[in-house]
Amino acid sequence: MLQPARRKYRKEQKGRNTGISHSRGTAVSFGEFGLKAIGRGRITARQIEAARRAMTRHIKRGGRIWIRIFPDKPISQKPAEVRMGNGKGNPEYYVAEIQPGKMLYEMDGVDEALAREAFRLAAAKLPLLTTFVVRQVGQ
């Protein structure tokens, strides 16, 4: 699973996931087809991997897949049945915070019908709304 190799600080505050993706990471840059987020939320490293596996299994050895997001925010949790207080819990997993317009995955080397179905299977593993996009001519 994806996670940062090192961090300056182990724990991070919750923060608020606001705004939209304006220019960076909003266009199909590497492949021919893309899966773009139209909802807002957090995607865990496990969900990113589950979606990648679903796509890879569907296209078999056909094309190439790019993952355009990385889970770099640690989420801490206290153990079960522990009383409140006594500090913040330990980092349990990592998430990528997603704003609307962010490109999640890209694919190349397959036809559109196969890519559309692979992205549909991947979208079922993700907790936010997505849409299928095709690279524009001249991009």
From Swiss-Prot:
Composition bias type Basic residues, residue spans: 1-13
Membrane is among the record's keywords: no
GO molecular function: rRNA binding; structural constituent of ribosome; tRNA binding
Record keywords: Ribonucleoprotein, Ribosomal protein, RNA-binding, rRNA-binding, tRNA-binding
RNA-binding recorded as keyword: yes
NCBIfam families per the UniProt record, alphabetical: rplP_bact (TIGR01164)
Complex formation: Part of the 50S ribosomal subunit.
UniProt name for this protein: Large ribosomal subunit protein uL16
